[in-house]
Amino acid sequence: MILWGGSGGYLVIILYTIMPVKTIEEYEYDFFRFILIFFFFQKGSKHLSVVISILKYINAFKGLLFHVCLHFCSIHRRLFQYLVRVLQVFQLFFKAAVISGIFRYTIPIHFLQKFFKLFDN
């Protein structure tokens, strides 16, 4: 994924290293936001819809992980943060690959094309 993501992927990884772990309230928000988006947001091109769906499912999985850990497990907070961090890494790799790979060829929007040129060598 990183190789396919190109320099955009490396930029996201650098940004990731300075990002804090989300709070529990933010994961709860992600979970409910996923439900709303799933039912009300089904627009865009076929490729864009697939990408958005994958990102929605990743966010939903993080939300479900939060609820399971909070209500049914006596899991240590550090372990929970580690699991969340693994999911964040996967999500950021996927976003980086999408930004520098797919969107360039599927969205014919002028300002987005200019933006993606910044990530090219």
Curated annotation (Swiss-Prot):
Q: Name one GO cellular component term.
A: membrane
Manganese as a keyword of this entry, yes or no, is no
Q: What is its main location?
A: membrane
Localization annotation = Membrane
Task: Provide this UniProt record's keywords sorted from A to Z.
Answer: Membrane, Transmembrane, Transmembrane helix
Q: Which residues form the signal peptide?
A: none
Q: Where are the transmembrane segments?
A: 1-21, 55-75, 92-112
Q: Which domain of life is it from?
A: Eukaryota
Any miscellaneous information on file? Answer: Partially overlaps FAR3 and STB2.
Can you name this protein? Putative uncharacterized protein YMR052C-A
Which organism is this protein's natural source? Saccharomyces cerevisiae (strain ATCC 204508 / S288c)
